[in-house]
Regions:
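Extracellular fibronectin type III
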Residues: 220-235
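Short, acidic Ser/Thr/Gly-rich low-complexity loop/linker segments typical of extracellular
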Residues: 60-76
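Short, ordered, surface-exposed loop/turn motifs in non-cytosolic proteins
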Residues: 42-64, 150-154
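Bacterial Sec-dependent N-terminal signal peptides
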Residues: 1-42, 235
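Beta-strand-rich modules
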Residues: 200-222
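A short, solvent-exposed beta-strand micro-motif common in secreted/extracellular proteins
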Residues: 77-81, 85-98
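Compositionally biased low-complexity segments at domain edges in trafficked proteins
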Residues: 119-152
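Structured interaction patches on ligand/partner-binding surfaces of diverse proteins
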Residues: 96-121
């Protein structure tokens, strides 16, 4: 009996080792997808931050209702994923501070490039700034490319960081929420005519900061529409 058990153990062990030593026959990711997110007016890259837009991919090659995967935007308004499987996809920019867009169907194989045009909820216009001592003063106006159906405006916030990665996910908190301007109102001619002034006091002397303004509406995602980034050198 002991010999039988020992023999079976050796046989099972050999089978296990053999199965583990076989090479994985599944091919790995073989495709890449990249592109730009463009403002529909300026045709320049959409003002966003890292992860401020999610590019949703649904692979339709095997299912009509696939589980989506997402490519987060980069801070410069581009996106890229180099580890995809070739296939037929529906691609939709989502979860950002822009009016919903229809997805497109596209074959992704090799390196595929596709740009998307977005209409922001808000634009920050007439953006100006000055430094008074250690206080940064930023001024702007707001415009709404589409007024009908625009969600309520929430606020305008300053974002300040010591690198050029600056936005709601990369900011020095003491410079942001205490200095925000609450709006909490529907779009109106009064809002369109107003110049907003945001002050950020007590910047540290001898430091270089990167700053911008962001305005948001009360939609599901509460992402920000941004100004350009400015560089502030505090004497």
């Amino acid at each position: 009996m002991r010999k039988i058990i020992t023999g079976l153990f050796i046989l099972l062990s050999a089978t296990f080792v053999s199965s583990c030593s076989k090479e994985d026959n599944y091919e790995g990711p073989d495709a890449a997808f990249k592109g730009r997110l463009l403002d529909n007016d300026s045709k320049e890259n959409f003002m966003t931050e890292t992860g401020g837009v999610q590019v949703k991919l649904e692979e339709l090659s095997w299912s009509a209702t696939p589980t989506p995967q997402y490519i987060p935007s980069k801070s410069d308004g581009t996106f890229e994923d180099t580890k995809l499987f070739s296939g037929h996809y529906r691609v939709t920019p989502a979860n950002g501070a822009f009016w919903p867009v229809e997805g497109i169907e596209i074959d992704i194989n090799g390196t595929t490039t596709q740009d998307f045009t977005l209409t922001p909820y808000l634009r920050i216009t007439q953006f100006e700034h000055e430094l008074q001592g250690t206080t940064l003063i930023m001024r702007c106006k707001l415009s709404a490319p589409k007024e009908a159906g625009l969600p309520r405006l929430l606020d305008i916030k300053p974002f300040v960081n010591i690198s050029d990665y600056v936005g709601s996910g990369a900011t020095i908190s003491q410079y942001t929420d205490p200095n925000k301007v609450d709006i909490n109102a529907s779009w109106s001619d009064e809002i369109a005519a107003k110049t907003y002034e945001i002050k950020v006091p007590n910047l540290k002397s001898g430091r270089t900061f990167y700053a911008r303004l962001g305005a948001r509406v009360d939609d599901s995602y509460k992402q920000f529409n941004y100004s350009q980034i400015i560089v502030i050198k505090v004497p």
